[in-house]
Amino acid sequence: MKKIKTLKKNYEFKNVLSKGRFYVGKYVIAYIQKNNKNENFFGVAVSTKIGKATKRNRIKRVIRECYRLNQARLKKGFNIVFLYKKDSKFEDIKFSNVIVDINEVFDRANMV
């Protein structure tokens, strides 16, 4: 299994958020930008306005796992940042709900 390449630096996130195209789902907003490389880079951001750290970490784990399962079927050469929508209820953050939402976002972005 391939390791997920992640965006780590603040300027990498800012670059994708400012120059990338965005696609809105029910639970997440995906910002996608071409990177002219032969691999995808991935990042997740959850606002501190959403609960305590345990809730935010749970949300990030679910989103990362959904990305990991879709990673093999995606087109290569993109930077992808997922933002969790603040108006979504934490109780709705079930893996089955989020994976359907992320699949729809990738379909709309023509990444499959």
Regions found by a protein language model. Give the residues of each.
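Positively charged, solvent-exposed patches that mediate nucleic-acid binding
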Residues: M1-V112
